[in-house]
């Protein structure tokens, strides 16, 4: 973890047709946001979900990477034809899309030369100059290009990798939270909550989250 900074923010970009179609339910947004906040003092200020379409990926990469200190992407870095995140980021930043020597060796050792096919080799290709995010689960690394952290879409693999992002991040101020369980009707306390929020707006963020018993 790098030197602490007062306010550090991030965006999350979820890439995948399967999320937009409803076939797959995203589990990465909540995990990444919670991990960044509790471990790094980094606030997630925006989340977008987009399809596997090069032009849309490029547009969002450029927009969000300029807007926030960090951008975390998930999905699209696997071995199949529709995994186009790495080449899209290369085009966004106008750098070569090429084999990363260390990533190539990691994957070749993991699969063995006889089973290291073109699809698996593809997972070693990324934007030139990228730093690796090591993968203790299935070998294929994620990568960091400028301030963009690219991780896989499979939640269990992403979870196993995310600690390896920490040393590349500048830590922000830690946010502390407290939960009060009030067994009352929300509308009866809305005025008081609004008054407290207005009075302490610079240091406190109050939310009301109803539940049914």
Q: Where do the language-model regions lie?
A:
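Proline/glycine-rich low-complexity loops and linkers
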Residues: 56, 84-172
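Generic secondary-structure signature for well-ordered alpha-helical cores
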Residues: 37-43, 49, 66, 70, ...
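Secondary-structure boundary/capping motif
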Residues: 21-24, 56, 81, 158, ...
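Glycine-rich phosphate/diphosphate-binding loop of Rossmann-like nucleotide-binding domains
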Residues: 2-52
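N-terminal small/polar loop signature for handling phosphorylated ligands or for N-terminal nucleophile
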Residues: 30-91
